[in-house]
Amino acid sequence: MTRYSRITGTGSYLPPHRVTNDDLVAQLAQQGIETSDEWIVERTGIRARHFADRDVTSSDLALEASRRALEAAGCQAQDLDLIIVATSTPDMVFPSTACILQNKLGANGCPAFDVQAVCSGFVYALTVADAMIRSGGARRALVVGSEVFSRILDFNDRTTCVLFGDGAGAVVLEASEAPGILASDLHADGSHVGILCVPGNVYGGQILGDPLLKMDGQAVFKLAVGVLEKAARATLDKAGMTDADIDWLIPHQANIRIMQSTARKLKLSMDKVVVTVDQHGNTSAASIPLALDHGVRNGQVQPGQTVLLEGVGGGFTWGAVLLKM
């Protein structure tokens, strides 16, 4: 019998501290940096984001999102036999945030590890979990994207500090006789490392290089709009489907312009795109599961519908997953 995997529950969590554009404008003005709500909205579509308190970690956010996903799936943490966390802002250098989350959930014993593909991280992690379930290596997996990007932002750079927020999203992925994950397509091109990175490191207890986020926005935009269409079409081809079969597009919530461009290339109305970037900002690996959970809980995404997830991020990494809810 062919074995498949299917999402049986979704969950998400945003830290309570909500920062509007006006809040950020006022903060930056105190540092002599000029920007405006209009400037941010016009270029990004972002109106607000959430920042975690100083003592809150990625695993803390992941814990809340995971509990909600487990509840939605009707299972307990002890039922898990795999945990994968996608994050670029781990609690520690090691052990993995997944191991820390596993302990907080009380799911000790199952394999747990992190995936680091920045904003493509959740798509990568979901693909790995699907492969492990299909091969018989797992039966019920928890796949999480969780980030505290506010820790690595340069608040002297108005072009980047307004873009990102903190949050977590999670799904429970279970073995199924009916196809859930239909196809996926992953890519990376390390020749573009410098256009989106945090170029710092730790050596002998000292920080080497720059520990804050750097981005060439124009280069990222140009590359993203091209590779996202290619990944989408490759994934659809693998599943024997076309643009017309997509009920919902859930892209990485980076920038409304990138999302609009991707939808246009796939001949999709924006009415078929789940958009949360306006309220959450770019939450990196958390953005896709956050948006998916939002779509499920507000009644947009219905059982049986076909959903295309797309991620693109530093590395440069990108990919897509086509699934049936």
Curated annotation (Swiss-Prot):
Cellular component per GO, a single term: cytoplasm
GO MF: 3-oxoacyl-[acyl-carrier-protein] synthase activity; beta-ketoacyl-acyl-carrier-protein synthase III activity
Disulfide bonding pattern of the chain: none
Location in the cell: Cytoplasm
Pathway membership: Lipid metabolism; fatty acid biosynthesis
Similarity section: Belongs to the thiolase-like superfamily. FabH family.
Protein name: Beta-ketoacyl-[acyl-carrier-protein] synthase III
Gene: fabH
